[in-house]
């Protein structure tokens, strides 16, 4: 299967389940022109199959540059690992103007939204069932699974973490994107300074 690049056929569990008592925020990027880093961040959870068992992966991405700012693995679907990823991204890269999620209970929970509200970040949420509203990170998941997860069938959590970490580093640092003139996500997020001549 690995050599033939065959994708296993199975029904992935849903990673987004709405909580009936949690507040749902409107989708803010609908008519927004995104022109700079830290204007909009997004996050999502995906299912990571292993040879025996599975894990859940959450990532925080800068929408403009496509750079993965942080990520976490967990064997449960609680909000804790999502909050850890959010706090890490904010500690390393500051705060976005808008933070977009789906309507999953992890992201609508009071603990998660409190982190954003305390930082005065505007909260945005996809329309129900509208994966296209968070298409940037959905494309990331597709590439990660096709190029890393399905080709390796990791045995353990540590192997999975190492493999995903290597892939994300390569994605951030080496993969060019046509939308940014073939710059990598890291280059688009942190444009190189123009060399200026210093007057004598």
Annotate each PLM feature.
Residues 1-200:
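Charged DNA-binding/catalytic regions of mobile-element recombinases
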